[in-house]
């Protein structure tokens, strides 16, 4: 036997062999249908911006949880609308009254229903906590006194509200409240 005897020789070129292989394969799989994949469920691709919006809405509704219409905190009837938690010094309330704290966030509630106002108030508090805003101004207006009466009651129930006071004239006077919030340490 010579060296060349065990070598296989082809009469056709490699391209012809490849074409034959493909045609044989096609003949064998003719009539086969693709199986539908049903074991792995792929989550739809979500836009990161949509995730952020959903998270913000969830945080706002979580903060809305604190606002009950049934609970009546003890607020003084004399003088301007004001409130301070027991662990907040009177000096802080005085600084709010004088306008020493300048609000970084303003919420205008004019024309809102009570439910919209609760939701927006919760969203504002969530935003302030997220952005480390210590003072905010809530403009409830005067109108029929519905929001003017309820906003202080809602704010007094929230655990992150340290104090609030009727705003000085430059921030809305009798139709607004300056709110002092506790910022969590990181």
UniProtKB/Swiss-Prot annotation:
Belongs to the SmrB family. Residues 1-20, 41-60 are annotated as: Disordered. This is Ribosome rescue factor SmrB. It is an enzyme of class 3 (hydrolase). Residues 107-182 form the Smr domain. It comes from the Bacteria. It comes from Vibrio cholerae serotype O1 (strain ATCC 39315 / El Tor Inaba N16961). Transmembrane segments: none annotated. Associates with collided ribosomes, but not with correctly translating polysomes. Its EC number is 3.1.-.-. Pfam families: Smr.
């Amino acid at each position: 036997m010579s060296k060349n005897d065990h070598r296989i020789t082809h009469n056709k070129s490699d391209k012809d062999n490849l074409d034959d292989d493909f045609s044989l394969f096609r003949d064998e799989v003719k009539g086969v249908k693709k199986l539908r994949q049903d074991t792995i469920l792929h989550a739809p691709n979500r836009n990161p911006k949509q995730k952020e919006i959903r998270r913000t809405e969830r945080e706002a509704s979580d903060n809305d949880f604190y606002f009950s219409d049934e609970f009546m905190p003890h607020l003084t009837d004399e003088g301007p609308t004001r409130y301070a938690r027991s662990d907040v010094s009177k000096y802080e309330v005085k600084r709010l009254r004088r306008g020493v704290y300048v609000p970084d966030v303003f919420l205008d509630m004019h024309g809102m229903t009570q439910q919209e106002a609760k939701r927006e108030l919760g969203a504002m508090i969530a935003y302030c906590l997220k952005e480390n805003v210590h003072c905010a101004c809530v403009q409830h207006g005067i109108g029929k006194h519905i929001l003017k009466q309820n906003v202080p009651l809602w704010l007094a129930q929230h655990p992150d509200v340290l104090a609030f006071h009727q705003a000085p004239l430059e921030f809305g006077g009798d139709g607004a409240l300056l709110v002092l919030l506790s910022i969590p340490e990181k």
